[in-house]
Amino acid sequence: MKGQSTARLEWTPSATLPKARTSFAGVGYDEMLERARRLVPKIAARAEECERLRRLPDETERDLHEAGLFRIAQPARVGGADLDVGIFVDVCAEIARVCPSTAWNIGNLASHHWMLGYFPPETQDELWDVSTDVLIATSLAFPAGRGRKVEGGYEVSGRWPLSSGVDNSDWNMLGFMLREHEDGPPVDHRFALLHRSQYEIIDNWHAVGLCGTGSKDVATKAMEIGRASCRERV
């Protein structure tokens, strides 16, 4: 995909994302924790399915969207609950009692709305204008990715491990080492925000007890992306 346009990407949300926009602004700590507790029986009933599928079941993903658990740290300006980091610990502890993989995905994917808030406004809009419920995976193994500056942005390539929740996600934040020249030493770290059409998911995750995290590798060949699709480490 070398030479691909760095213009704003038009994308279609996954079928599992809610069609209607819902605001969770004003939902407080206690209410969000109670929402997690009410989901425990359903998640417990699907725990074996989650491990068998090696990803979140669609029904579980929909339940988590409806409850707002993926949006606990999303900025309030786009309808997120905008709660502090303590809610991650308590919500995930409740869910982990019955399905550690689901708990892992909640904490992991919910934190990426917070991370997206550090990208330029036009990049936030590229995702949240289409769906405020968008799911974003990550792999923060910076040495796994390589990048260099090109006109208008960066050229990025690599193979990244442990991209939890990648099958349920439409986007991915992938770490890379920035080099001034192809064979030069790293000079900085960056995140690249890529749509799932821009990388390959490699089906190699079979960890006993945490198969449902779906922490597969992802890879892309030389890919040019716009400057607004990259940022320094949060």
What are these regions (language model features)?
Residues 58-66, 71-169:
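Glycine-rich flavin
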Residues 159-199, 204, 214:
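DPxDG-like acidic metal-binding loop motif
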Residues 2-28:
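Intrinsic disorder at enzyme termini
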